[in-house]
Amino acid sequence: MEIDREDGRTPNQLRPLACSRNILHRPHGSASWSQGDTKVLAAVYGPKAGTKKNENAEKACFEVIWKPKSGQIGKVEKEYEMILKRTIQSICVLTVNPNTTTSVIIQVVHDDGSLLPCAINAACAALVDAGIPMKHLAVAICCCLAENGYLVLDPNKLEEKKMTAFAYLVFPNTTLSVLPEGSSVAEGEPVEHGIITSITHGVMSVDDYFLCVENGRAATASLSAFFRKNFQQSSSKAG
């Protein structure tokens, strides 16, 4: 039985999406990404010469700096930085600019749920805007398990508080289907059935987890279509 949520959405329905790129002048690339009332800004600086200690100088290095809307960053934000860094390293070509560091700054504007996936989508758009060579794009989504056993996608803040478990899922998206012609893309392995990042919190059964993955992957079609439309519009304006 399909249940309607408090905001009127069906379980698998995403909130309205909005994305703008090249919105800041100082960074090499920038983007804002909104899902409903959740909004994040992402800025990319680099690549700059040199890598930090304990980084592989033979590859491109990425650092992620998370800036909350207010106050200092805590344990959760540090975890977000680590997840974002690993995700970015998975989708970017690390052999093109060896011994360099690219900084990705995430600024939270408003958090109304599904904050980390929103930040990942913003970072991906900003990396494209900066012209960073990428193996493929990433589309991120949050899938939650409610107390009644129903799964819902892209929860808002109120829904998050009522959930017993949730999964942050990041799927690869073929760059050829999204990026305009002439963009920096490297040939990579087939990624149609892959998953880049999977983070779970709370307790859910194996069956529920795989259902999350199935529903999440299905929902990325609309995210990918939105990416494609946004990038093509930006490309035509630039042309």
Swiss-Prot record:
InterPro entries for the chain: ExoRNase_PH_dom1 (IPR001247), ExoRNase_PH_dom2_sf (IPR036345), PNPase/RNase_PH_dom_sf (IPR027408), Ribosomal_Su5_D2-typ_SF (IPR020568), RNase_PH (IPR050080)
Gene Ontology cellular component list: exosome (RNase complex); nucleolus
GO MF term list: DNA nuclease activity; double-stranded DNA binding; exonuclease activity; identical protein binding; RNA nuclease activity; single-stranded RNA binding
Enzyme nomenclature, EC number: 3.1.13.-
Subcellular location, principal: nucleus
GO biological process: rRNA processing
Localisation per UniProt entry: Nucleus, Nucleolus
Keywords from the named record: Acetylation, Exonuclease, Exosome, Hydrolase, Nuclease, Nucleus, RNA-binding, rRNA processing
Pfam families in UniProt: RNase_PH
Signal peptide: none
Residues with PTM N-acetylmethionine: M1
Function: Probable component of the exosome 3'->5' exoribonuclease complex, a complex that degrades inherently unstable mRNAs containing AU-rich elements (AREs) within their 3'-untranslated regions.
Family: Belongs to the RNase PH family.
Subunit structure: Probable component of the RNA exosome complex.
Protein name per the record: Exosome complex exonuclease RRP46 homolog
Protein species of origin: Arabidopsis thaliana (Mouse-ear cress)
